[in-house]
């Protein structure tokens, strides 16, 4: 019971921190230069002129919200703020990159993916390969098609 409550409070705090970060980015308000992920996330998003809390939508089965995103050809930059203690995975950001490509259909030829996860006092930076993102895009298309067919069969 205590663990459930603790997890709930941590999730609630994470939601509040994401909302604060989005507001600070939208208002272009930088925060203290400290090696704290929250501050680095906000300052970097402002410096790169990123849009906070951007919905990426391909279908009713495939969507997500990027914490901060900007596309300036040929670079798609996605940053994610993690407020919990679980080990971060770049896979979520690669899915967001795939959703972006499916929704906005940029020229994939020279596209670069600059992905960052901000957690605790560190930043994990990753540069994904186009083949990895295209593979995820194909999975999303296939699963969406399958779920659409299953949904029609259930009507």
Which role does the model predict for each range below?
Residues 56-138:
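Nucleic-acid nuclease catalytic cores
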């Amino acid at each position: 019971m205590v663990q459930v409550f603790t997890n709930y409070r941590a999730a609630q705090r994470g939601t509040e921190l994401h909302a604060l970060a989005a507001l600070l980015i939208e208002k272009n308000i930088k925060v203290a230069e400290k090696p704290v992920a929250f501050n680095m996330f906000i300052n970097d998003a402002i410096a790169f002129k990123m849009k906070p809390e951007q919905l990426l939508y391909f279908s009713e089965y495939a969507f997500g919200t990027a914490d901060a995103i900007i596309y300036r050809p040929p670079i798609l930059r996605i940053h994610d703020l993690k407020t919990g203690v679980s080990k971060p995975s770049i896979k979520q950001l690669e899915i967001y990159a795939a959703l972006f490509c499916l929704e906005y259909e940029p020229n994939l030829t020279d596209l670069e993916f600059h992905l960052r996860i901000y957690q605790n006092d560190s930043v994990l930076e990753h540069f994904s390969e186009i083949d990895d993102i295209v593979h995820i895009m194909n999975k999303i298309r296939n699963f969406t098609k399958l779920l659409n067919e299953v949904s029609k069969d259930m009507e």
